[in-house]
Regions:
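Alpha-helix C-terminal capping/helix-to-coil transition sites in glycosyltransferase folds
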Residues: 70-71, 188, 240
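NAD(P)+-binding Rossmann beta1-loop-alpha1 motif at the extreme N-terminus of oxidoreductases
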Residues: 1-53, 60-63, 90
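Rossmann-like NAD(P)(H) cofactor-binding subdomain of soluble oxidoreductases
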Residues: 55, 62-70, 74-146, 162
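Internal alpha-helical scaffold of NAD(P)-dependent oxidoreductase catalytic cores
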Residues: 83, 94, 119, 123-127, ...
Length: 311
């Protein structure tokens, strides 16, 4: 049994906390929001983010970051990408040398063009940073539906340790040393999913969606390989797998936001309607900047930026 804290109590953090708890680990969930923590502790259910999914009595909840971080075997960082750097900075004083932090969010920082793991390493240099990614909607993981993901880490030892911690009968975990490729696939697919959703909102058919997914992964792979990612990463679970589920699923907030824009909503109206973080909106500008920096043609990413910021 490991002692684990999940930093961030959104839908994905809640689903992973439940998975880890079912695996027999001692799990604490942290949120900066006192009302959210009180509600979770009392109701044992996140009714706004993961309704109908009950949390065990053994799970603990806190707003005390020091208490959440210190003495834990590993930490799961599950805050929205725009809060990754700030949260990591606040965690830093309490993180022990070599303590494992698994980032499970997806995004690229617009100002620096850094991936999330790079931001965490920047703020917490003493940590052993890993990532978890793949086609995995929180709603399905919370319900115990079969899911397959990949853990990326710098060392095989860390990757295999996390594989053992997360793996269950319904949650299969592969390992990869290609953290950069995994993170690029996970963040850039959100931008392509906005395009796929917009096509749905405009009433276009399956032919259009198939084209967007296929040409979308080609764009992602071109950039990712130029930046140093491995080709097989983009044609595996954390590339095409994640892209398919995000472009096609009813659970996908990026697809839903795109769908609403296709129906005539503005970006702001669509984001308000979705009521959860739409990571693709925050990654779109960064994706365009990366394409220019590395001189890679990404026409879908270009058009998404035009729809979002010039429409």
């Amino acid at each position: 049994m490991a002692k684990v804290s999940v930093i961030g109590a959104g839908s994905w953090g809640t689903a992973l906390a439940l998975l880890l708890s079912k695996n027999g680990h001692d799990v604490t969930m942290w949120s900066i929001l006192e009302d959210e923590i009180r509600m979770l502790d009392k109701e044992r259910e996140h009714k706004s983010k993961l309704p109908g999914v009950k949390l065990p009595d053994t799970m603990k909840f806190t707003t005390d970051l020091k208490k959440a971080v210190e003495g834990k075997d590993f930490l799961v960082l599950a805050v929205p990408s725009t809060f990754t750097r700030g949260t990591a900075k606040n965690m830093c004083p309490y993180v022990a040398k070599g303590q494992i932090i698994v980032d499970v969010a997806k995004g690229i920082e617009e100002a620096t063009l850094m991936t999330l793991s790079q931001q965490i390493e920047d703020e917490i240099p003493q940590a052993d940073v890993a990532v978890l990614s793949g086609p995995s909607h929180a709603e399905e993981v919370g319900r115990g539906l079969p899911t397959t993901v990949v853990v990326g880490a710098k060392t095989e030892k860390t990757a295999e340790y996390l594989q053992q911690m997360f793996a269950s009968e319904v949650f299969r975990v592969y390992t990869s040393p290609d953290m950069l490729g995994m993170e690029l696939g996970g963040s850039l697919k959100n931008v392509i999913a906005l395009a796929a959703g917009t096509a749905d909102g405009l009433g276009y058919g399956d032919n259009t969606k198939a084209a967007l997914i296929t040409r979308g992964i080609a764009e992602i792979a071109r950039l990712g390989i130029k930046m140093g990612g491995k080709p097989e990463t983009f044609y595996g679970l954390t590339g095409i797998g994640d892209l398919i589920v995000t472009c096609a699923s009813v659970h996908s907030r990026n697809r839903k936001a795109g769908y609403l824009m296709g129906q005539g909503y503005t970006m702001e109206e669509a984001m308000k309607e979705v009521q959860m973080v739409v990571e693709g909106v925050y990654s779109a500008k960064a994706a365009l900047e990366l394409s220019r920096k590395y001189q890679v043609e990404m026409p879908i990413v270009e058009q998404v930026n035009k729809v979002l910021f010039e429409h």
